Amino acid sequence: DVHSTKLYLDEPVDLILHEQIGDFLFDEAMVPNVCDLRDRLLKPGGLILPSQFEFYCEPMTMHDDRREPYIWELDDVYGFDFSSMERSRPYDAEYNGLVSCDLGVVKHFLGEAEPVIKVDLNTVTESSLPLKISFSRKVVNPGILDGLVVFMKAKVDDDLELSSSPLDSKRAPHWGFRILRLDQVDTELGDDLEVTLRVKDWADPETWRWTCGVWGGGDLNE
């Protein structure tokens, strides 16, 4: 076995067929690895399959029986109030995120899902990926804002699409999705959600930082 960056051939190829797709699209270094092969080994006009991807980061609510509040959100457990523990809350991404492939975790998205990044491996470069994404969602499905769910879609051709969406019953089962947790806030129909995701390294979700502002029915969360 050899890593793709160490692969050398006598002549260029017509096709790059890969499965470098991470659970959250970028976490298996798909972009730098495939771009390296493309620039070194693919003939002009050659094909990359799959080459078209969408990255999603959607505000969502969880099923009640799957919701696990932060300990400082528990203010009446048999008379005990743990809210003071917020002063000691950890801010590392590992504590504030979780990974699952269970279709029973996410109840619904709060807004209409739209891709926040589209990737075309025929043209993308690693340096062209944004390190800050800001976008808004209008609440059309009210509920508790539990966090942001990160997933991807891969468009193989006009007839075949692969998804890691937590709401897709036909999703590729071996791919997970990532939940970026937030303090719980109740949202109402018509509320505006303002999301910002900052990234140092797309391949390392522990470098991601996120906020979500709720306007019209809540407070700023981070």
Give the residues covered by each predicted segment.
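Class I SAM-binding transferase module
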Residues: 2-198, 202-222
